[in-house]
């Protein structure tokens, strides 16, 4: 049996009179007084099928029994629709197929939610449980097809640039990379475990040691971490590494890759992309992931704050904190109620409160008006280039809290006041990150321990490691980090030094990274790399609310697969085979 001669989007007036066969799902079903209409849907489109009781009574009885989402194969003749009955919204809207034979290929149970009315809101957990039905609603499939085209464009471009796609192992060794590993017990080596890769980091660097020169891979990675809207326990990244190159060699390649990926959707990206250091981003936007679609840049107000008799300002200055904020053009229309909402909002991020100062035609209004002279406020307005009807929003807090609070407030106000267009795509390279950070009193890597320090800062490793900058870079799009990379350490002695600063003992270094240090000791070329988060890029490109909307079979925010009911308990015999005992 041949299931189809045409797809459901292909028939047109040029096919009138032809005998055809189409197959698909019953999208909609209508019985209009002895005439049954079926919208038959496949991945490509919809074709209207018609069966008239007075012409084919037995066939009509069979067709009248079908229900939504049954799978049919229909044979019939293409006819022009009656005048006035055309549907301009369908590629096949000028024709219909008069049914002559129908095969019911598969029946469907009662549906947990409507498929034909894809505008109806459906609970996300229900959608994930019945992901295969959710796909039929169209939007998920469209995004998966778009994702395929983006991946295809990526592969074609990387091949032209001389990169070789290499598939690296999924079963590897557990090495500290920041997040928890997913572990796989070994049956052959009792008590030993593989780790699923958080990234192909060490493998791709060893490929450079092996002389591959230019590598890429669309890799699946795994991280056992707390999830957010833009995080999943398994995710895809476009992984890239190249030898004998500097960031200035890499950036144009990645920028053109971005152009190729976005051109799939017909989006034009202007090159070169702007660059900004980590410190500049923190100073101007409070974050290393700035959204550049709108202004509201931060300004340091410490010099002005010294002229206030406001104890919160003076206390922060005495404790080494900061006072900074931004100007909202036309923001003097914010009510006290709205400002109270913003005050409670910034408290979520550790701020004690929000200072607001309105520049009005008849003077100023502020919750700190009595703590400074008119001249001080005028100087502040001038510093912010504030005009009448603008408002200054300030926070006094330790630097990290002020930055985090203002970053979130800035994003919120930008969205609420429609300061940007959702179809804008503003990229920026963020460079020169700190090499180290301090967490819970311990030094840790800002990115990962294989990142090279800037040459001019290497001398500070012994005296002031927290001030050392790294040769690292992130690519940020509309406030999302979509790529991250760095120049790698290619010297075994320097790599050992970094490990020792991270308080890894010689025994621990040998146990976890001995193979890697050994590889670096056999003549390693200077090399660098980057990884682009494919899921996150697709999320931004499609306007999806989260990366679950661009992944075929995603997990929930609790890392559960509701469709397969995973994770799940396994049989006692399997545990015994793996020499594992579950204690709780």
Curated annotation (Swiss-Prot):
The record marks 32, 84 as: Important for tRNA non-discrimination. GO terms for cellular component: cytoplasm. Homodimer. It is found in: Cytoplasm. Aspartyl-tRNA synthetase with relaxed tRNA specificity since it is able to aspartylate not only its cognate tRNA(Asp) but also tRNA(Asn). Reaction proceeds in two steps: L-aspartate is first activated by ATP to form Asp-AMP and then transferred to the acceptor end of tRNA(Asp/Asn). Its EC number is 6.1.1.23. It is an enzyme of class 6 (ligase). Gene3D superfamilies: Bira Bifunctional Protein, Domain 2, GAD-like domain, Nucleic acid-binding proteins. L-aspartate binds at residues 177, 223, 447, 488. The keyword ATP-binding applies. NCBIfam families: aspS_bact (TIGR00459), PRK00476.1 (NF001750). Keywords: Aminoacyl-tRNA synthetase, ATP-binding, Cytoplasm, Ligase, Nucleotide-binding, Protein biosynthesis. ATP binds at residues 223-225, 232, 481, 533-536. It catalyses: tRNA(Asx) + L-aspartate + ATP = L-aspartyl-tRNA(Asx) + AMP + diphosphate. The keyword Ribosomal protein does not apply. The gene is aspS. Residues 201-204 are annotated as: Aspartate. It comes from the Bacteria. This is Aspartate--tRNA(Asp/Asn) ligase. GO terms for molecular function: aspartate-tRNA ligase activity; aspartate-tRNA(Asn) ligase activity; ATP binding; nucleic acid binding. PANTHER family: ASPARTATE--TRNA LIGASE, MITOCHONDRIAL, ASPARTYL/LYSYL-TRNA SYNTHETASE. Belongs to the class-II aminoacyl-tRNA synthetase family. Type 1 subfamily.
């Amino acid at each position: 049996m041949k299931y189809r001669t045409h797809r459901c989007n292909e028939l047109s007036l040029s096919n009138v009179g032809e005998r055809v066969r189409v197959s698909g799902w019953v999208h909609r079903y209508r019985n209009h007084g002895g005439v049954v209409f079926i919208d038959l849907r496949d991945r490509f489109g919809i074709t209207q099928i018609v069966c008239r009781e007075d012409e084919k009574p037995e066939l009509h009885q069979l067709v009248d029994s079908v229900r939504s989402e049954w799978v049919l194969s229909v044979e019939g003749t293409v006819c022009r629709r009656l005048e006035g009955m055309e549907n301009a919204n369908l590629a096949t809207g000028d024709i219909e197929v008069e049914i002559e034979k129908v095969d019911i290929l598969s029946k469907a149970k009662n549906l947990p939610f409507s498929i034909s009315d894809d505008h109806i809101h459906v609970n996300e957990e229900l959608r994930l449980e019945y992901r295969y039905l959710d796909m039929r609603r169209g939007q998920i499939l469209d995004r998966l097809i778009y994702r395929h085209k983006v991946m295809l464009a990526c592969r074609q471009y990387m091949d032209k640039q001389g990169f070789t796609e290499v598939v690296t192992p999924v079963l590897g060794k557990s090495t500290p990379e920041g997040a928890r590993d997913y572990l796989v017990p070994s049956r052959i080596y009792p008590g030993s475990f593989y780790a699923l890769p958080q990234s192909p980091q060490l493998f791709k660097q060893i490929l450079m040691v092996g002389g591959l020169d230019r590598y890429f891979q669309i890799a699946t990675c795994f991280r056992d971490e707390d999830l957010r809207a833009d995080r999943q326990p398994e995710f895809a990244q476009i992984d890239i590494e190249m030898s004998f190159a500097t960031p200035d060699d890499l950036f144009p390649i990645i920028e053109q890759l971005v152009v190729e990926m976005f051109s799939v959707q017909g989006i034009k990206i202007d090159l070169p992309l702007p660059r900004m250091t980590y410190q500049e981003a923190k100073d101007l936007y409070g974050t290393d992931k700035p959204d550049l679609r709108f202004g509201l840049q931060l300004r340091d107000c410490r010099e002005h704050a010294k002229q206030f008799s406001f104890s919160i300002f003076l206390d922060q200055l005495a404790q080494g904190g900061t006072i900074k904020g931004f100007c909202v053009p036309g923001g003097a229309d914010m009510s006290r109620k709205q400002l109270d909402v913003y005050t409670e909002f910034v408290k979520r991020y550790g701020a004690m409160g929000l200072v607001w100062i309105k520049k009005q035609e008849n003077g100023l209004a502020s919750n700190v008006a009595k703590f400074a002279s008119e001249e001080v406020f005028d100087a502040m307005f001038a510093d912010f280039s504030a005009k009448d009807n603008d408002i200054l929003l300030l926070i006094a807090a330790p630097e990290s809290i002020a930055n985090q609070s203002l970053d979130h407030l800035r994003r919120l106000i930008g969205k609420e006041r429609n300061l940007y267009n959702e179809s804008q795509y503003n990229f920026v390279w963020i460079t020169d990150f700190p090499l180290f950070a301090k967490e819970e009193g311990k030094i840790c890597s800002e990115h990962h321990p294989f990142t090279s320090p800037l040459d001019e800062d290497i001398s500070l490793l012994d005296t002031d490691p927290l001030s050392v900058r790294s040769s690292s870079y992130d690519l940020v799009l509309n406030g999302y980090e979509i790529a991250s990379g760095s120049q790698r350490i290619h010297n075994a002695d320097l790599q050992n030094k970094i490990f020792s600063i991270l308080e890894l003992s010689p025994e621990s270094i040998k146990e976890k990274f001995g193979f890697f240090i050994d590889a670096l000791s056999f003549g390693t070329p200077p090399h660098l790399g980057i990884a682009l988060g494919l899921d996150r890029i697709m999320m931004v490109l499609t306007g999806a609310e989260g990366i679950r909307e661009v992944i075929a079979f995603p997990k929930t925010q609790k890392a559960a697969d509701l469709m397969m009911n995973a994770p799940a308990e396994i049989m006692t015999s399997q545990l015994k085979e793996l020499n594992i005992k579950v204690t709780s």
